[in-house]
């Protein structure tokens, strides 16, 4: 049986209420300094720096400049006066982040270059070599910057959900089940036949089909949880899921 795992962030909850998310904590700070909001925005930044880096690269900046831009942008985001500038009408972190970066590129970057980047601190751990390799591997040559951003955002969500899912199988003592069946959710290489998986795992084909069903179901739940952390309302969640699905399929 696939592991259940913890589900502390599942949204909405059975009562119909929409639970607190990282982004709602930031918006609800209401322009005031909040240690809880700082932690929340830093978690979001650490999770989603790469789509922004890819966007900056696609805007024409080289690897080193894109890293500098991304670091300096987040140095300003994770700052004590950040919350006073958050527009509460921006219901989705993805939309807000792209708009904030465009403003930074247009109005703040030249000023930032005259100062020491991020006060000399690396706030978000960026692996420049890994980021560049990923960018070169995944980027479609004719993609517009905004399309690159949304594509990489969607891929990051899927990767985070898959990482959490594998961790749950490891915790349950069955990593081999995930490793054998992951192609059924990855959309990459062709998955094995049920018969092949049954032989590899020592199960019946019927048991493999059930395991794949549970794997897909839990993966979809985790994707929903990841998206939920970047929005504030059930409507935003459903709209964002639909939009990202079109991005993945495009």
Predicted regions and their residues:
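Intrinsic, short, N-terminal disordered tails of RNA polymerase sigma-factor systems
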Residues: 1-250
